[in-house]
């Protein structure tokens, strides 16, 4: 029996640590005979499409169970699903640990494995085809996917997401020897990549430090764990997890990007690239680090560049600057030397927030004659830097019927105000947006004062109203928007708050659960049914099926009707369903963690 368990452990370790060096540095491998670059015009990656095709029957069965449990009135679930294929995508915004923890509560509300007495939305995670995250949302999606898509309950019980100390010093002053060992190990790991003749940036150090709380259960905190290794996880092999996508932005040094000109880079376990006209190409994730010329290797091929922590760090590279703060601590001198050596590079010194992806895999690519393909170097930044802080863009290319957009951004007083949706809406009219349609949304003032950030809101409820955006109106997803707000915890913590004790952590997670479930269903006993109505809406429209009276009632309550608010601001406090000037409902007397602004780690200019 002991031997049997040892064999299982060996198999697991083999599956989850495929870096050829068995460490952080990439290593040489045999080159494949196939082309490593492909055009985005070919559509979804064949491996991804095969995964989705195999997963969909599983997801559809879970959707059937959810819809049956949602108590939809006068609606035959089985008959509808026999002729319809609704597809769900989940998108988790950036926002540091605020976004990760609130998002954890939100995803736990969708998970049928969560232990709860109020399973209002349980099963939607199992019914989803895609899950995307950027910046703090990438910490959530990346750590879950890298841990076999464990439930949030299991992540906590297994000791992950231990945030009592900052990821900059995971063990803290209480364990000085272990803390120095961590810094020594991180320094050695990053040095090994540099010694293998790969450029390193602050993201390499930051990504390794970040892996301590996020990849705690992997060997050596994930120094050899690759993002492409997710495909070897048992829940991926059995098609039990939504397909995970992380997001970053491409940015040339010393330039500024906005929603209209950014190159949105997808980091999936299979591919790395962008649908945007500025690139429109993808490379096999496993072979990042290989020098390519027009998609063909010019020398040795490498695997191991796609370290999972490095990828999560890339998506959240805003936090690179945090690494500079540890140079003031008692860290080993050679780690300081590595940081100093990185900053000798004038590009990396003046662009602290970039991640170096050198060599550029798209160099001289025949399919793209843009600034990206003409440069030997590729630099990526935080996925939210262009203002699109919810990773909706990749889902718009994957023909989903409904998108759950979880917005835990910092727009006003560390609360979201809809800016991310506004930026994604505006982008469709730019050359980079390439006409990929997204539903109408209002301005930020309307978002707040029509209470669209205080209770869930649906956008794109009627496809017939989208004809001025696209002729393919049924291909535009309905967006289910849920913004961070207080119910049981004042969850507007600073993006740069890097420590949470167990009570704070649980407070944030629990509040996220309440956001998604509408206070455990207490504010609307038809909330599950209304979510079901939103999920099935596009397929109903495609088939000319009229909504039930219940669904019409739901849409009356939750759909934005096109109104733009011009009146006086309603206030900054929260009621159950909106903003208010009153301080009698959600305030310091009855909600824990009141206005915990956290501590900024960024140096003031």
Swiss-Prot record:
Q: What is its main location?
A: secreted
Positions annotated as glycosylated: 199, 261, 399, 451, 465, 492, 573
Localisation per UniProt entry? Secreted
Similarity comment text for this entry: Belongs to the lysophospholipase family.
Which GO MF terms are attached to this record?
A: lysophospholipase activity; phospholipase A2 activity
Q: What is the official name of this protein in its record?
A: Lysophospholipase 1
Under which main EC class is this enzyme filed? hydrolase
Q: State the organism named in the record.
A: Candida albicans (strain SC5314 / ATCC MYA-2876)
The reaction(s) catalysed by this protein are:
a 1-acyl-sn-glycero-3-phosphocholine + H2O = sn-glycerol 3-phosphocholine + a fatty acid + H(+)
Q: What does this protein do?
A: Catalyzes the release of fatty acids from lysophospholipids. Phospholipase B may well contribute to pathogenicity by abetting the fungus in damaging and traversing host cell membranes, processes which likely increase the rapidity of disseminated infection.
What does the UniProt entry report for the null mutant?
Reduces dramatically the ability to penetrate host cells.
Give start and end of each PLA2c domain.
30-565
GO CC field: cytosol; endoplasmic reticulum; extracellular region; extracellular vesicle; plasma membrane
- What does the record say about induction? Expressed during candidal infection of mice.
Annotated GO biological processes are: glycerophospholipid catabolic process; migration in host
* EC id: 3.1.1.5
Note the PANTHER family from the entry.
CYTOSOLIC PHOSPHOLIPASE A2 (PTHR10728), LYSOPHOSPHOLIPASE 1-RELATED (PTHR10728:SF33)
Signal peptide segment: 1-17
| PROSITE patterns in the record | PLA2C (PS51210)
Q: Which InterPro entries match?
A: Acyl_Trfase/lysoPLipase, LysoPLipase_cat_dom
Q: Which UniProt keywords apply?
A: Glycoprotein, Hydrolase, Lipid degradation, Lipid metabolism, Secreted, Signal
Q: Which gene encodes it?
A: PLB1
Upper lineage is: Eukaryota, Fungi, Dikarya, Ascomycota, Saccharomycotina
